[in-house]
Structure formats: C-alpha cells, structure tokens
Design a protein with these regions (language model features):
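Bacterial N-terminal signal peptides that target proteins for export
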Residues: 2-15
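Bacterial N-terminal signal peptides
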Residues: 13-24
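Sec/Tat signal peptide C-region and signal peptidase I cleavage site
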Residues: 25-29
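Auxiliary tRNA-acceptor-end handling modules of aminoacyl-tRNA synthetases
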Residues: 30-314, 332, 336, 347-510, ...
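Zn2+-dependent metallopeptidase catalytic core
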Residues: 97-98, 317-341
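Short pre-active-site segment immediately N-terminal to the catalytic Zn-binding motif
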Residues: 314-318, 505-523
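The catalytic-center signature of Zn2+-dependent metalloproteases
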Residues: 346-369, 517-524, 529-573
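Conserved catalytic/binding loops enriched for acidic/polar residues
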Residues: 458-493, 509-514, 539-954
Length: 954
C-alpha cells in the first residue's frame, strides 16, 4: 500500500507541475517580444497512431464462456483440457467499485467439510493496473458528514487481501481481472495438518475450479486447492468463495444490545458520538431481518422468513426430529405475532433444492457430516456494519449418535484445559508448579495452544479433549468472533454414552425415540445460535431436582429455562428407560421466549423502541431469565457456581449426589454387564473409565461452591434487582467441603477391587483407527491422582484463596467463611489428625497411610509450598502467603512429633513419605532469600545452599 501511495503522490506532483507550467505560459508570453507571423505555415507531419493501451477484449476472452451475475466470470469449458483451467477472468462493473460486499469462505471438501471459514467486508478498488480487494476496518464508523471522518479514515486505513492484475477492459469500460491465481493462492489459511515436516504449499497447476456460479447478487466460486508437502506427499482442500452484495444501509434497523440478554454482537466505535456520552462504542444485536409483513395484524407472516434447507445427506429416520428442532423456535416468534418466521424445506434429488449448493451464502443448510468426532455447530454470518444476520449453516456429525468404546481420559491435559478454559492453561504455563500429577508442561502448552482464539467457545465439555482428531488436524479453527464453535454435541455424546451404559446394565437399550429427542434438542440449540443467541449456562439451575423429575414424567413442559445451556440427559439411578416420558428437555424454555422477544419484538407504531427494550431487559432479575455465558464459566476464574455445563437443578450438591449414586450402581457389578462373553476385555476398561470419569468430574459442581459468588446481570433500577455479586452462605460452602471430604478425597471413592483392576487391559490394535497405549497394565495410581489433583486444585488455587480472602471484607455477618478456615479445613481433609498409631503395628502390606492418601498429601504439600515460596503478591497477597507458610509449619511440627513417638510402629512407605514431606517443608520454608541486583528487587529462594567462605545471607 505504501508503494501505491507513493505512486499516487508522484502522479499528483507530475500533473500539478504540468498544470502549473501550462498556466504560466501565457504570462511569460505577454512580456516577450512578438515575432511576426510567417506568411504560410508548412504542413506538419502527423504523429504515428499509438498502439492500443490494453489487449483486445474479444481476443482475451476468446473461447471462454461468460457467466453474468454480480460480476461476469469468464472461464474455459471444463472438458477442454487444452486450456488452462485455473484461469478465471472476472469483469467487475465500475458501479461495483468501492461498494461494500461480503466475502464468505467455507470448506467444501476435506476433514472440515461444511465448516464456515473466514469472512470479510471487502471492496473492489482500481489502483493503477490492479484491482485490489480492500478490507475496510468495519470496527469504526465513518461518516463523510462528520468533521472527525478524515481523522478516522487516516488512522484506521484499509488493509487488503490481494491485488488482481487487470488484463483488459470491456467495451463498456469495466476492468477485466485475472482472479484464478489469487483465489488458488489462496486468500485464507487452510485447514492442513501441522507439525514437523507437515508444511504445505499450494500448487496451482494441480488445482481446479470444480464449480463456478454467478447470480444477480452473489457469485460462488468453488476451488479445489492442491497442497504439496515437504515430504512429497500432498492433499487437496475444497474452499468455496462467495461474494455477496450487502443490504443497503437504511434497509435494516440495527438493535442495540443489552448485557442482560445473551446475543452475539457486532461492535463498532463511533468517534462522532458526543463527549458527554460515557462510551463511544455501539453494540448491535446480531439478528435476522424478521418482522411482520402486515404490522396491523395480530398474527402476520414475516416479510422475509428464515428458510432452512435440510440437506439430503441427513438420514431418513432422523429428518423428522431435525425439522422439529428447527421449527421449535417458531413458538417464540408466534408470541410476537409472527407466524411461520422459520420455514423448513427438505432437499431431495429431484426437487427445487436439488442443485442448490450449501456453500451458497443465500441459503441456510442443515448438513450431515462424518468426521468421527461427534459434534454439531451452528455458525452464522452477520453484516459487520449493522449486525443483520445474512447466512447460517448447521453441521451435525454422524458420530454423535454412535457409541464408541474409546478411552476418555477426562482428566488429561487436553480435556482439563477444555473444561477450565484458556485462563487456566495460561496460569499453568506461567506457574508449572501447579500442574497436577499426571500432566507435563509440554502437554499443558499443547492444550493451551489448541484453545487459542476459539471464538465464542472458551472451553468444551471435559470429554471433548479426549476425542480423536481427523487426519491429524484439530477440528477447532479460529473462527470469526461473530460465529460460534459450539461443543454441546460433543459433551452430549458422552452423556449418551453414560446413559447407554446405565441402560445396558439393566439389560435394555435406549429407544430410538429418545435418540430422536436428543437430535431435536441439539438442532434447537444450534438453530438458537443461528438466530443470534449465545449460550446460557444458568438455565439448568432454574428448577429443583424434584420439580424436574415431576415435569419429566408427567408433562411436556421444559425441564430447563433454555435450550441454549448444555443440558444433560435426565436419567437417574433406578429409572426404567421404557417408562420415561422424556429423556431430555422437550422444548424451548422461558428464557428462550424472553431472549427472542428482546431481539425481534417491534415497538408499537409511533412507540419508543428504546423504552420497549428497556422494559423487556428489565425483567432479567426473574429466576427463569438468569443469564451466564462462556466467559462466566472459565474454571478457577469464574465465581458463579450456578453457571455450569451439563448440570441440572438448583442444587449442585444434590445433583452431584445423584450422579455419584448412578455411577456407584453401575460400578457395583460392572463385570457382569459391561462385557459379553465374546467381546474383548478392553471394552470393560473403556466402560470403567467412562463411569469413573463421570463420577469424578461431577465433583466439579461441588468444588465451585467454595468461594462462590452469584453474579447477577440485572441493573439497579430493575424490579427486584439483586446485588451484582452475592456471597454464598458460609454454611453452604462448608457443606461443599464436607461432601468433597467424604467422596473424592476418600480411598473408597475409587474402586480398589483387585479382580477388576486386573481385568482392564487396553486395546492392542495397531492401526490408523486405534489409539494404542504402550502400558498394558492399568495405571491405577495415575488415574486416581489425576482425578484427585484436579479436585484439590479447585480448592487451594491462588485464585480461589484470594477470592475467599477478599470476600471477608464483603460481609458484615458474624459468621464468615474465611481464608484461614479454608486453609485449615482443606489441610485437615487431606492430612486428618496425625495421631499416634496406638497399639496398632502397621506393615508394608497394610500401611498406616494408603498409597492413595500419600499421593494426595504429596500433591497438597506441593501446591501449598508453591504459594508459600512465591514472591509476595505474585500469586496471593502477603497475608495469605503467611497463612500458607504457617499452615505448613504446623504440619511439619505434627509430622515431627508423630515420627518421634512412633517407636517403629509405622510402616516403611508411610515413614518415608512423612520424613520426606517434613524435610521438603522445612527446606523450603527455611531457605535463605537473597536480594539479587538488577532484578528489580525480586527474590530468589536457594534450596540446599552450599556452605563456604563466599556465602552471603540476608
């Protein structure tokens, strides 16, 4: 761009100089002597005709077929192999220059087929012998009528995607450009495997354009891009470009967003807003242009309905449920007087949709794909100037409905990172001393990289990270923030797997109608995203467990406030699958109706839309309208224990107890039902891990109560407004600690049945489909450690300790849950009372402290010493650090007294553990702190400092 600017300046200087010279000539001539005119003027020779500036248009497009549309495309017939099939000429009307267009890209073939990819607001601009695809910065409002406009344009100038050479001009003056090369370059990053030796480069000579279509308002170009690898192996990826004319400004009325209602937003900054306003940022709701065709009618069809086409790839047996999931949202629009806001069509081989391309941005498709991962996603594209949604496509992976016997390491690095969010993984990378046992720093770094820039979705189901990838390529992509990468179906697939096991234990199977209900729920969830709605992870905390069971068994009412939560299947220990009325929430809930009202309700004729929206959003303090989304549920940094994934009911402790009861019932006789006589034993291993992973991960809901604070989005002027943050009652936090102490921190929470543990071999298949495990015997200790370490970190992490400590100033009650109490109680839970063994003499086979308890204690001490030895203020306040240090000093003293008085009654393993723990505590707490010059006053703790003449201590 700098070169083009320099060229413009040079051209301006040359033109100015010539104009100046021409204007000066008459003035100079007036002062010069006038020569007499000759009698006759000899004939001057005529200059030779200049060659044409551009090649002849007809010659350039000879043998090419024109395809008129938004712009005219010229290409050779596909069957003519004598021609360059990568050559694609485009005649761009001059009237289209500098007009706003949407360039949307999609993956049409390959592992990510069906994914919406990158999209841009673009403009065509002629610059010399080039047509540039410029990308204006849509974040900033420009208005030529405002005096600040020049400053805005100068500061936030355009970027560009590519420059296309002009090859000729059409007879009407339109430039004709070569677009084939730039599109095959390509214009966006492609989903290709990464890693050593996996770099891929595009090969134009091997690439093609399988499909090109031009329409009056859009052009679709499908490219098959060949990619060559360093090792000689290659691959191809289908990438579809769709250029689309954007609606005229003024044809759609943007709607101001409100943080109390969960919508995706389009955010713009307007520097012309008055200085008296608190912000110069405008946030628009992302929504369709859906309104009554006749506003005078109580019930009217929409002026522009939203049309979804179910792709013919959707299996026949599930089409009914897919259609019902889409149409479910019509109920919310009907309450606003709009009938048939959403229209569902079915694509077949011979109807009017037979040849419609799902990548065509004019159509909204529900697509069926087969990646092997089992997920669904509902992204949409919105006008970056107004938030008007223009296009949406939902993809549904077939594997969602297939129960695979895979090992799901729910507490491995990837799934833990997925569950806890990017802030948690960043914390572990920066403070590796807090990495739980069973993880490595490299694994955490890999997990952190996989979460970078995932758009709306900040973390997944805990099971998601344990899923296989396809062709070595991760299925997550850095999507445009206006879209969502939703992993509801990934986690729900694990819910189905668990339900499958529970039903199989009773000798039955899940009826197809319940599978259909799950499909309907997932589709409704993803369609909600395409309507503009974000996740609402508070919706499942609306009703009590008793009310949920009553509704499930006797009514068709919603079981949760919104389908935009990650809602679990509703199956409890003792349920008879054949007698259930519902298996999952059957319909949209009250929050969904309310959110659609905010986004799509029209003000009465002559009414004040701002006042109408305030009246709607002002109801947010109602229990059924509570809202929390992705950024409210990012693990250790999230305060609200009512915002969770795959929980149910208003009581996390009761819900966790129900899930543990179900898991215990399955574990009791697992060998009798998990594997049939002719099935391999590794099915038993995967079944056991699935049940145990669910049992342990359900403790997450309980641990979040400790240090919890309810976050309310209502405003102070709303009816029945609550404080923005409400501390949980101390009694409730103590109940949570009591439950954790009696469950996941006890040995008997984990199955120690030797016969079972000796019957859990891994699969030994060594092929592309399998994930071979090198260790054949079952890693019992590692499995327990990973589950306990994660639960422990949720109680003693610096974030939780600091939050509990700060909360002491936020309550005037006599009874407070303090940081001192938390530190003391957790230490007592893990270590208990280190009393003398009495008359008991422990042996190596029957130790005083079990191996499970020793590992838990070791992890606890590691966490607490990491806090104690950190730089004051780096992890927690100095006051908290003092408490952590003193707690460790007390523990060291208790261990010392026990060792001194045991008189040989303690077994070898316990004695080694206690001795090493005391030594570690004493060495860390008594290490000298040295002030090092040049390090800004920081401290370095030297452990095991040698003695010598040069030793200096401070």
């Amino acid at each position: 761009m700098n070169g083009l600017l320099r060229a413009r300046r040079s051209l301006f200087a040359a033109v100015a100089a010539s104009v100046f010279a021409a204007a000066s000539l008459p003035a100079l001539a007036q002062n010069a002597p006038v020569a007499p005119a000759p009698a006759t003027t000899p004939a001057q020779p005529q200059p030779a005709a200049e060659p044409p500036k551009w090649p002849d248009f007809n010659t350039v497009v000879k043998d090419m077929t024109p395809m008129p549309g938004l712009f005219t495309i010229y290409r050779y017939k596909a069957e003519d192999n004598s021609k360059d099939q990568t050559r694609l000429l485009c005649q761009i009307p001059r009237a289209l220059m500098k007009q706003d267009l949407l360039l949307a890209t999609s993956i049409s073939r390959g592992a990510q087929a069906g994914f919406q990819w990158d999209d841009y607001l673009v403009r065509f601009e002629i610059q010399g012998k080039l047509v540039v695809i410029a990308v204006p910065d849509a974040r900033f409002v420009t208005n030529a009528a405002q005096t600040v406009n020049d400053a805005v344009s100068r500061t936030y100038n355009d970027s560009f995607l590519t420059a296309m050479p002009i090859v000729t001009y059409a007879p009407n003056g339109d430039p004709v450009v070569e677009m084939g090369g730039p599109l095959l370059a390509p214009l966006v990053n492609l989903p290709a495997p990464s890693g050593p030796g996996a770099a891929f480069a595009p090969r134009r000579e091997m690439s093609t354009f399988p499909k090109v279509k031009a329409f009056p308002d859009n052009v679709l170009i499908d490219a098959d891009i060949a990619l060559a690898g360093r090792t000689g192996a290659g691959m191809s990826v289908g990438l579809t470009y769709s250029f689309r004319r954007l609606p005229a400004i003024g044809s759609f009325t943007p709607r101001i967003a409100d943080e109390r209602v969960g919508y995706f937003t389009t955010v713009r900054q307007d520097w012309a807003i008055k200085y008296t306003e608190r912000e110069n940022v405008i946030r628009y709701v992302n929504r369709w242009d859906v309104k009554k065709k006749d506003a005078s009618l109580d019930l009217s069809p929409p002026e522009h309905p939203i049309v979804f086409v179910i792709e013919k790839t959707v299996p026949l047996q599930w089409r009914k449920y897919v259609a019902e999931g889409i149409a479910e949202w019509n109920k919310a629009y009907e309450k606003l007087g709009i009938v048939g806001a959403i229209v569902v069509q079915q694509q077949t081989d011979d109807n009017e949709f037979a040849n419609v391309d799902p990548e065509d941005s004019r159509y909204n498709f529900i697509r069926w794909i087969v990646t092997g991962r089992g997920f669904a996603m509902g992204p949409s594209r919105a006008d970056p100037r107004t938030g008007q949604i223009l296009d949406a496509d939902i993809i549904f992976d077939d594997s969602m409905l297939r129960f695979y016997f895979r090992e799901f390491d729910t507490f491995g690095p990837a799934p833990v990172a997925a569950m806890m969010g990017p802030e948690f993984t960043t914390f572990l990378v920066e403070h590796p001393e807090f990495i739980p046992q069973g993880m490595t720093l490299d694994q955490v770094k890999d997990a952190a990289r996989s979460l970078t820039g995932q758009g709306e979705l900040l973390h997944e189901s805990p099971m998601a990270g344990a899923q296989p990838t396809v062709d070595g390529a991760p299925l997550s992509h850095r999507l445009n923030p206006s879209r969502t990468e939703c992993n509801y179906a990934v986690g729900l697939r694990q819910q189905l797997a668990m339900a499958h096991l529970a039903v199989a234990a009773s000798g039955k199977k899940i009826p197809d109608r319940f599978i259909g209900d799950v499909i309907r729920e997932i589709v409704a969830h993803e369609v909600g995203h395409t309507l503009g709605l974000r996740h609402n992870f508070k919706a499942s905390a609306w009703l009590s467990e008793t009310e949920i069971k009553k509704r499930r068994d006797t009514t068709d009412e919603p079981l949760v406030a919104s389908v935009m939560d990650y809602n679990p299947v509703v199956y409890f220990a003792g349920d008879d699958i054949e007698k259930l009325r519902h298996f999952i929430t059957p319909c949209i809930g009250p929050y969904d109706y309310w959110a659609i009202e905010y986004g799509y309700k029209s003000a009465d004729k002559g009414g004040d839309e701002k006042a109408m929206l305030q009246q709607v959003a002002g109801q947010s303090s109602k229990r059924e309208y509570a809202y929390a989304t992705d950024e409210d549920t990012v693990g250790l940094t999230s305060v609200d224990p009512s915002a969770n994934r795959f929980d149910l009911s208003d009581d996390p402790i009761a819900w966790s107890k129900s899930r543990v009861a179900l898991c215990d019932a399955l574990l009791k006789n697992i060998k009798t039902w998990a594997v049939k006589g002719n099935e391999p034993n590794y099915y038993l291993r995967s079944t056991y891990l699935t049940v145990m992973s669910h049992k342990a991960s359900d403790m997450m809901y309980v641990s979040r109560l400790v240090g919890g604070q309810y976050f309310n989005r209502n405003r102070s002027g709303d009816p029945d407004a609550k404080p923005a943050l409400q501390l949980l009652e101390p009694k409730r936090q103590r109940e949570a600690l009591d439950m954790l102490a009696g469950s996941i921190f006890k040995d008997d929470f984990f199955s120690t049945d030797a016969a079972l543990l000796n019957d859990l071999p891994p699969s030994r298949w060594m092929d592309w489909y399998s994930n071979p495990i090198s260790r054949i015997d079952f890693p019992a200790h590692q499995t327990v450690q990973s589950m306990q370490s994660f639960a422990l970190l949720a109680l003693v992490s610096p974030q939780v300790l600091q939050r509990v400590y700060d909360a002491e100033l936020k309550s005037k009650a006599d009874d407070k849950f303090t940081a001192a109490e938390l530190i003391s109680r957790v230490r007592n839970i893990v270590w208990g009372n280190l009393t003398q063994p009495g008359e008991t003499k422990f042996t190596d086979a029957k130790p005083m402290l079990s191996s499970i308890k020793r590992n838990l204690q070791r992890q606890y001490v590691s966490y607490m010493l990491s806090i104690a030895e950190s730089k004051p203020g780096a992890l927690v306040s100095a006051d908290l650090q003092s408490m952590a240090s003193y707690s460790m000093e007390e523990l060291s003293d208790q261990i010392g007294k026990l060792l001194a008085q045991a008189n040989g009654q303690i077994d070898f393993a316990t004695k080694a553990h206690l001795s090493q723990t005391k030594s570690q505590i004493d060495r860390t707490l008594n290490a000298p702190h040295m002030q090092m010059p040049g390090f800004g006053g920081g401290q370095i703790i030297i452990i095991g400092q040698p003695t010598g003449a040069n030793q200096q201590q401070k």
